[in-house]
């Protein structure tokens, strides 16, 4: 099955609740590639790449996040790129 790549923008109470670290752990467990970072507007942005089934599992996880997060929306956009591993990036 071909790989898919999505950019996610996650809104709500998603900073200061270990969202990014939890996403890195989840992505590694699912064998995904890409990155995640905080944005200055209080949201979290991620690019997720891998097998469609596993990427969809990550999107479902992103809608919930870790236990202390309160996710109000996840905007999903098609994306491109070629990534190795899943990285925590600096805020923008």
Swiss-Prot record:
Keyword Hydrolase annotated: yes
EC number(s) reported in the record: 3.6.1.7
InterPro entries on file: Acylphosphatase (IPR020456), Acylphosphatase-like_dom (IPR001792), Acylphosphatase-like_dom_sf (IPR036046), Acylphosphatase_CS (IPR017968)
Catalytic activity line of the entry: an acyl phosphate + H2O = a carboxylate + phosphate + H(+)
Active site: 20, 38
Keywords: Hydrolase
UniProt-listed Pfam families: Acylphosphatase (PF00708)
GO molecular function, one term: acylphosphatase activity
Recorded superkingdom: Bacteria
Enzyme class: hydrolase
Domain Acylphosphatase-like: 5-90
Family, per entry: Belongs to the acylphosphatase family.
Family matches, as PANTHER family: ACYLPHOSPHATASE
Name of the molecule in the record: Acylphosphatase
Annotated source species: Albidiferax ferrireducens (strain ATCC BAA-621 / DSM 15236 / T118)
């Amino acid at each position: 099955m071909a790989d898919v790549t999505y950019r996610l923008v996650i809104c709500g109470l998603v900073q200061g609740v270990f969202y990014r670290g939890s996403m890195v752990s989840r992505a590694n467990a699912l064998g995904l590639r890409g990155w995640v970072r905080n944005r200055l507007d209080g949201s979290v942005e991620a690019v997720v790449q891998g097998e469609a089934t596993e990427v969809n599992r990550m999107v479902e996880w992103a809608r919930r996040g870790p236990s202390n997060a309160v996710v109000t929306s996840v905007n999903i956009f098609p994306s491109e790129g070629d990534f190795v591993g899943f990285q925590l990036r600096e805020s923008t």
